[in-house]
UniProtKB/Swiss-Prot annotation:
GO MF annotations, alphabetized: mannitol 2-dehydrogenase activity; mannitol dehydrogenase activity
Source species of the chain: Emericella nidulans (strain FGSC A4 / ATCC 38163 / CBS 112.46 / NRRL 194 / M139)
Protein name from the UniProt record: Mannitol 2-dehydrogenase
Subunit text: Monomer.
Record keywords: NAD, Oxidoreductase
Family classification: Belongs to the mannitol dehydrogenase family.
Domain of life where this protein originates: Eukaryota
Function: Catalyzes the NAD(H)-dependent interconversion of D-fructose and D-mannitol in the mannitol metabolic pathway.
Binding site for NAD(+): I37, V38, H39, I40, G41, V42, G43, G44, F45, H46, R47, A48
Amino acid sequence: MPPLKLNSKNLAAILNAGKGQIKVPTYPRNGAVKEGIVHIGVGGFHRAHLAVYIDRLMQNHGVTDYAIAGVGLTPFDKKMRDILRSQDHLYTVIERSAKGSFANVVGSINSFLFAPDDREAVVAKMAHPDTHIVSLTITESGYYYNENTHELVSEHPDIQFDLDPANEKTPRTTFGFLYAALARRFKQGLNPFTVMSCDNMQKNGAITRHMLESFARLRNPEIAEWISKKGHFPNAMVDRITPQTAPADITALANDFGIQDDWPVVTEPFMDWVIEDHFCDGRPPFEKVGVKVVKDLRAVEEYEKHKLRLLNGSHSAIGYAGQLAGFQYVHEVLQNDTYKKFLWQMMQEEVKPLLPEIPGVDIDEYCRTLIERFSNPTIKDQLPRICLNASGKIPQFIMPSIAEAIWVTGPFRRLCFVAAAWFRYLHGVDDAGNKFDIEDPMLEELQAKAKAGGLEPHEILSIKSLFGDDLRGDKRFLQEITTAMQLIDRDGVLKTMPKYVD
């Protein structure tokens, strides 16, 4: 039997053919619900995270006021618009684990607006009274945030275009759209909508607020003041491993579940979301579907610190050394027993002692869960994906733990091994002599420093925007990282790693 095309009329047949391994939406859609959320940036992570939480609220708790209207701002988003439109805005989330696979057809995205076709329609949608939340997954570059000055990159041509009052109905950037819609609500006497960042950034809500208020001040100080007083921008921590969809995933969905979906999402069973309870125009009852809704930024930051230092730090440990060792996927690295022991000991002995205690959170269990997630052979999470843009990761995920360990005279040699592996990775050649590509906005400067420094860390550490000044003067740190660099250069990752395992 050929696979069934994913659309509304085929849902019953898809469910019947699924033999208990498929879920489909049975809740009202289209005109029977209100689109209370407008989401900018409908990619894999959004469709595996926020859209799934909303799907569960609609399916299990009768929520009808918070369906999602997706928005695409870039030409790349046309493909997503076309595929979702052809499937009645339905898509499949494939959860994979060592225990098997499960397919969930998600219907929480109710419509999709492609901004290049009609920018005014997007502004009007966001300004509509039914819109309570505008959520974002626009990646770091979409925030026009200068990490050195912590200010809006106001000189960017697209920001300059959006600051021109003549272009208010045809904005280009997220902040141009947000401002135009909020200005319209201001003039209509409505409340502002909540702006909810779902990007994997520290203080994502605070950054969003500062960037939008900065934009608005340049445009209209009165509206900027209104946004400052009445607008809410909750901070959040998000987590779900979501690799890019491959052609093989589309084929497997058709073969294993009988569903023809042109752009499914593949992910793991685990997902997490901690969000500050800071909304100005209502919100869904997120607590009912497992979201941790907390009272303030400090509570978010405690969860975030666990994730950044343990999950993201471990990803860094797996990625750069794993690529040097010739591995392709995350789970392959974890199949090496020495590597698995290294990861566990780094988390338990060097990172865990630095973390705050959170009521109800068992750090040991969290670490075990991470090892299980990383070991999942069905996700096929590629190392190049987690190695992307390391200049924004190592200074966040590894170096702060080293600095804190030095401060409390704790151990940090394994963390130094991770940093040394990244320094070596910058040469773009693995331990067998095979070249690989590196994607990093600072690549030219980093590679020049790596080449000039040789087997000494001083040149790379001289980049103050990444490393500051403190570590460069610590003799213990310099000795540990230099030793690791020299051992990796001489013996390679796999022969060096046993020296870092007890």
